[in-house]
C-alpha cells in the first residue's frame, strides 16, 4: 500500500494528493499532526534518507526558530528530537511504497518516474 506522509494543509501535499488521485493510485495519507510520528518511524526515515534531507530548512517553521535552536541541530539525534517535537519541520511529502526507496518531495516528473517503475 502506498503511504503519503505529511501535513494536510501543506500546498505541496495537496499537489501530491491531487496527482495520486488523478492517476488512480490508491494511497493512505498519514498526517503527522493527526496520526502522530513515533520514533521508530522517524528513525526509518532518517536511516534511509538522512536527517539533513528530512529537515526542511527552507520552510517557515525553520525560519521561525531562534538561531540558538537552529545551531543545536548538528546530528541525527538532535534533528530527530526537533522533528518529533515539531513535525511541520519535516520536508514533505514523503512517499513510501513497500520494497521501493522512499521518495521525498513532489514533482510531476518524479512521481511519474516513481510509479512507472512500480
Curated annotation (Swiss-Prot):
Listed transmembrane segments: none
One Pfam assignment: ArsC
Highest taxon, organism lineage: Bacteria
GO cellular component assignments: cytosol
CDD domains tied to this protein: ArsC_Yffb
Active site: 10
InterPro entries for this protein: Arsenate_reductase-like, Thioredoxin-like_sf, Tscrpt_reg_Spx/MgsR
Annotated family: Belongs to the ArsC family.
Protein name in the entry: Protein YffB
Protein species of origin: Escherichia coli (strain K12)
Amino acid at each position: 500500500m502506498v503511504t503519503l506522509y505529511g501535513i494536510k494543509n501543506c500546498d505541496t501535499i495537496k499537489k501530491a494528493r491531487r496527482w495520486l488521485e488523478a492517476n488512480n493510485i490508491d494511497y493512505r495519507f498519514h498526517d503527522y499532526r493527526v496520526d502522530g510520528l513515533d520514533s521508530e518511524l522517524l528513525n526509518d526515515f532518517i536511516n534511509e534518507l538522512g536527517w539533513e534531507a528530512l529537515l526542511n530548512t527552507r520552510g517557515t517553521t525553520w525560519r521561525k526558530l531562534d538561531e540558538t535552536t537552529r545551531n543545536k541541530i548538528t546530528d541525527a539525534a538532535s534533528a530527530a528530537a526537533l522533528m518529533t517535537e515539531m513535525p511541520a519541520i519535516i520536508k514533505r511529502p514523503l512517499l513510501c511504497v513497500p520494497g521501493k526507496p522512499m521518495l521525498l518531495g513532489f514533482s510531476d516528473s518524479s512521481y511519474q518516474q516513481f510509479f512507472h517503475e512500480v
